[in-house]
């Protein structure tokens, strides 16, 4: 008597893959968010997250940059974005904000990272898990962390502290996706 046919095997494989993907996605945000929706900078993001891109904020006067913003996405977030056109629930984005130093080089005026100012962390939340927390809304968790304290946010309300910078990107789920070439591949 045949116990397992090709149909049962295929169903088993699909269930295993779906379970693995669900666990992987839910674990992406777990280390970053506690039960009350309080966030912190993920400790291992430089080792485990994928680089998305860098933005240069130009100097107020003259040439060069005043800041560099270097952005990373949690494991699996880029692959999911490439497949479905948006970040999946639980995806974590970390933006490092560096003061920039500028100097003349043989290639022209250049700006390079100098001192870390802090981190901006966003966690995708399409399910509205933390409705009573003022750092959650519009499908994301939002928090700024000063350099030196990756565990304590200085943000108090995403609407007043974070959202205004993202209004031009509202049509792309509040993320400036045009600056991340890896999302287009």
What feature does the model see in each segment?
Residues 28-36, 41-54, 58, 65, ...:
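Sequence context surrounding c-type heme c attachment/ligation sites in exported
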Residues 19-21, 99:
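N-terminal low-complexity, intrinsically disordered patches enriched in charged
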